[in-house]
Every structure is written in C-alpha cells, then in structure tokens.
From Swiss-Prot:
A Gly-cisPro motif from one monomer fits into the active site of the other monomer to allow specific chiral rejection of L-amino acids. It is found in: Cytoplasm. Keywords: Cytoplasm, Hydrolase, RNA-binding, tRNA-binding. One of its GO terms (cellular component) is cytoplasm. It comes from the Bacteria. The gene is dtd. Coiled coil: none annotated. This is D-aminoacyl-tRNA deacylase. Disulfide bonds: none annotated. Pfam families: Tyr_Deacylase. One of its GO terms (biological process) is D-amino acid catabolic process. Homodimer.
Length: 144
C-alpha cells in the first residue's frame, strides 16, 4: 500500500463540478492499493501518515505531524501509484488490487484516519479533479 503525501495549505477534490472533499492546512494523501494489501497494512500506513513529521516547529524544522498542528487529511484514491513504469512508454497496472478490494481498503484507510483526526475524502473510481496548494513544496512517498 502506497501513500503519496503532500503538505498543503489547501486542497479540494471535485466530481462533476461538485466539491466532495476540501481541507485547509493538512495533508493530501493519494492512496494506491496493491495486490496483497490488507487491513493490517492499511492501519500501519494510516499510523505512519498521521504521525509523519512534515510540519515546521518554532525553529522551522520538520518536527510536527498533522495531528500536532491540528491539520486535516484529504484522502484520494490513486490507482496509478502501484503501476509498473520500469519499461517502455506505457504503465502496467497488474500490481494494483482488484477494484472491490481496493475500494474496501481505501474506505478502511479513510475511516481509520477519521478516527484520529478530521478527514475528507474523494470518491472512489470517479473522474476527480484535485486542486491543491502544496506548502513547501513538501511531498513524501510512504509504502508499507
């Protein structure tokens, strides 16, 4: 399971022109679910995402996590993250989880985030338009 996290000052996701999720300061989490992923991996990844120190302290060092700055999380499913891009000019998607499994684990991950801090989410498998202001920019790839 993969989370591409971005520290944002604002982010929103729209489906058919309607805002379905929106946050101010916090983390935009693009979540990719791979074959073999399960609830235990989703919970471990949620714990890493919500405790990963990406926000500046009083000395402007990245020592604070999203909970410590009272930020929010916006979780967006991203089936392209597990893609195989090592060869050729077209990605291979065989490493991604089956859509039903991916949706279940996406919802589980989002619910776990929601249990510890304010969480918004995109709409699984929808054609989404994601807008964000990346603060820094600060972007990390987390994988379990």
């Amino acid at each position: 399971m993969i989370a591409l996290i971005q520290r944002v000052s604002e982010a929103a996701v729209r489906v058919d022109g309607e805002v379905v999720g929106e946050i101010e300061q916090g983390l935009l989490v693009l979540l990719g679910v791979e074959k073999g992923d399960d609830e235990a991996k989703a919970k471990r990844l949620m714990e890493r995402v919500t405790t990963y120190r990406v926000f500046g302290d009083e000395d402007d060092k990245m020592n604070l996590n999203v909970k410590q700055v009272e930020g929010k999380v916006l979780v967006v499913s991203q089936f392209t993250l597990p893609a195989d891009t090592k060869k050729g000019t077209r990605a291979g998607f065989s490493r991604g989880a089956h859509p039903e499994d991916a949706e279940r684990l996406y919802n589980y991950f989002s619910d776990q985030c929601e249990s510890v801090l304010p969480t918004e989410r995109g709409r699984f498998a929808a054609d989404m338009k994601v807008s964000l202001v990346n603060d820094g920019p600060v972007t990390f790839w987390l994988q379990v």
